[in-house]
């Protein structure tokens, strides 16, 4: 646990990021810290973290960046392996405004975003790195030296896991989702990918310490070759995903509020899960639909926007 604590302390000490990156980190910490609750039909933001440094960072950011007061409460509980301490960051007033500010509540669908907001998933690389940093601060685990290598983040739901997988891909890293009992997790097992992710998140000192202590004996060059081999495919996939999201975003701008609910939901799913397949998008729909149905709805959304824009030009 000592090395994991060091990693989280190093990440929480970063203070030179742009506001968009700080917002992405705070949003991820709330989402992956199981921070969204419904109390008497009202939203309450209450995130649980295992790092005091991370909790202090989140409390300060909610106050200084979003303008809401947050409380920080340490709690302890006895387990078979000893006393476990957690830190609760709670927003007693202004939680509803905060989820709107973070993008965890969609203005388009009028529902909570189950993964990460599309503005982060499709955002700048600084936002992607910050989102992974926030997710790791909230739910991250790292293998101890001398044991099988892994970096893992416990996710609140499947959609959040998909968001991490797709954003890791934008960083050129392959992360795998898996289900352990009732828990959704995203895991990196390649030592070089773990070292690279630690550096990208902003923990170069911890990355060097972890790399120096690991004893798995795996050749580092193999991972580098695999990463280079995958780069071209990753770039092509990222370009196609970005183009698809741009078209949907443009359609929303053209149509404004005049969008049928089923088409709006399909478009928002594409924005929220840019790298998901049509089949995955269909499963994420509420209720679930086929990949052909989700593709048809997105196609009709784009056609409706094109028709509307054409009519406006003719009227002018």
UniProtKB/Swiss-Prot annotation:
InterPro entries: Homing_endonucl, Sporu_reg_WhiA_N_dom, Sporulation_regulator_WhiA, Sporulation_regulator_WhiA_C, WhiA_LAGLIDADG_dom. Gene3D superfamilies: Homing endonucleases. Keywords: Cell cycle, Cell division, DNA-binding. Residues 277-310 bind DNA. Signal peptide: none annotated. GO terms for molecular function: DNA binding. It comes from the Bacteria. GO terms for biological process: cell division; regulation of sporulation. Involved in cell division and chromosome segregation. Belongs to the WhiA family. This is Probable cell division protein WhiA. The lineage of its organism: Bacteria, Bacillati, Actinomycetota, Actinomycetes, Bifidobacteriales. The gene is whiA.
